[in-house]
Amino acid sequence: MAIRKFKPYTPGTRQRVVTDFSEITSAKPERSLIVSKHRVKGRNNRGVITCRHRGGGHKRQYRLVDFRRDKRNINAKVAAIHYDPHRNARLALLFYEDGEKRYIIAPAGVKVGQNVISGESVPIEDGNAMPLSVMPLGSSVHCVELYAGRGAQMVRSAGASAQVMAKEGDYVALKLPSTEVRLVRKECYATLGEVGNSEIRNTSLGKAGRRRWLGRRPQVRGSVMNPCDHPHGGGEGKAPIGRAGPVTPWGKPALGLKTRKKNKPSNKLVVRRRRRVSKRSRGGRDS
């Protein structure tokens, strides 16, 4: 997979960088694996906005993705690589020997015609799913379960991978993409390799309209609002914030505030916390 740059024929193409979609082998999804999905547009069940800047965008159909990989010891052939409008990663369409079809997150390097399998005694190859207890130390994994049988909950985005660091007792230490080292039960399943489409980080939308197509509405700075709408608002001209640091629209500190509960039960499974991102590298966007 590669990226595609455009010549500056228009202002919208000047900064536009997209993936070339060369790995996509079929434009139409598998009809038996798509369902309609209600677009909530950032609202809750009462219609109140709970997530700002959401709404609009192109119509989508949700692809049913197999995050459990619970068809054990049955060979599956990669029939096609499909585009998924709900995520940056691609989907691999699997045809199992018993006739069933399923989608999985497409690992990097997986080709059409390749065979993948899940189980405890399967080859150590990218795309195969197995318990963490049988994976070699130092191997890269993705689609990791937090609880056995619940399905993959971590390391599912494009280009992401975790590393098997150590095994001790009933737990396996994983280094996550955030640099956090966390203990996971050894019977939890994961898939070898990293998620494909890693070049997505080098793309650029190029214009505001492409962001609207993806269902994202404009984000207005708090400093240009009125005082009744945002703590940063008001003042004459380009007035400063007037506080020690930037805050959210509800008055909470916007940068550096830890939101994880101090007494969360899973804290004992975190061996090393993720690396802190400095304000300089994070940027102080006016929320």
Curated annotation (Swiss-Prot):
GO biological process, one term: translation
Residue stretches of biased makeup (Basic residues): 258-287
Protein origin, superkingdom: Bacteria
Pfam families: Ribosomal_L2 (PF00181), Ribosomal_L2_C (PF03947)
Cellular component terms (Gene Ontology): large ribosomal subunit
Alphabetized SMART domains for the sequence: Ribosomal_L2, Ribosomal_L2_C
UniProt keyword terms in alphabetical order: Ribonucleoprotein, Ribosomal protein, RNA-binding, rRNA-binding
GO molecular function terms attached to this record: rRNA binding; structural constituent of ribosome; transferase activity
Coiled coil: none
UniProt region (Disordered), positions on chain: 221-287
Transmembrane segments annotated in the record for this chain: none
Subunit structure: Part of the 50S ribosomal subunit. Forms a bridge to the 30S subunit in the 70S ribosome.
Similarity comment: family membership: Belongs to the universal ribosomal protein uL2 family.
Function: One of the primary rRNA binding proteins. Required for association of the 30S and 50S subunits to form the 70S ribosome, for tRNA binding and peptide bond formation. It has been suggested to have peptidyltransferase activity; this is somewhat controversial. Makes several contacts with the 16S rRNA in the 70S ribosome.
Protein name, entry field: Large ribosomal subunit protein uL2
Taxonomic source organism: Prochlorococcus marinus (strain AS9601)
Protein encoded by which gene: rplB
